[in-house]
């Protein structure tokens, strides 16, 4: 499940995320028994989704299409590239089960996330007693060609620490480790 950063499991038929546009379901070709095994061999394996879909919207033979549509405006969202925290093996990301990235933690806290917004460790679903954020992992680092500050991570970590305390059923100790706290917006220093 890419949207939940691989923390949740996805069924063969899924909606990418709750506010997806268009508000439509898709079939994961790798999980669908017909798409992954039956179609190539010409066998009618499973296809239970066709029977269950009252609207008759499932067409396993549909091919990709390229459409030209008239629109009133275009939103350009160039995106960003997430730093691969496993490159810095001394933090344990990818080796220690309880180490997650901020984006993964964001999905853990989300009501539409894999644990329904409950603050739990992904590997054992138990509530943590202590949480630490390590700032500037990969940024402000010439070695990884990211010698700049992202400009958002400090406020992001503060927000996550506050929300973690709100979502926890028991007191949780939160700590943010940083080189220097950068809060670039008006009145952000108050946090």
Region spans (language model):
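Residues forming the flavin
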Residues: 1-191
């Amino acid at each position: 499940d890419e949207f939940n950063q691989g923390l949740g499991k996805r069924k063969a038929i899924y909606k990418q995320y709750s506010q997806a546009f268009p508000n439509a379901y898709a079939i994961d070709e790798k999980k669908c028994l017909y798409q992954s095994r039956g179609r190539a061999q010409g066998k009618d394996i499973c296809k239970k989704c066709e029977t269950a879909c009252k609207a008759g919207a499932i067409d396993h033979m549909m091919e990709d299409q390229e459409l030209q549509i008239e629109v009133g405006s275009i939103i350009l969202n160039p995106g960003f590239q997430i730093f691969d925290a496993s490159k810095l093996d001394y933090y344990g990301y990818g080796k220690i089960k309880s180490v997650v990235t901020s984006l993964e933690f964001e999905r853990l806290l989300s009501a539409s996330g894999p644990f329904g917004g409950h603050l739990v460790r992904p590997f054992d679903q138990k509530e943590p007693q202590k949480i630490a954020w390590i700032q500037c992992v990969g940024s402000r680092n010439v070695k990884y060609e990211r010698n700049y500050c992202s400009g958002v991570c400090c406020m992001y970590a503060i927000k996550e620490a506050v929300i973690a305390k709100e979502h926890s059923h028991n007191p949780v100790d939160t700590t943010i480790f940083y080189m220097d706290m950068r809060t670039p917006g008006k009145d952000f220093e108050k946090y």
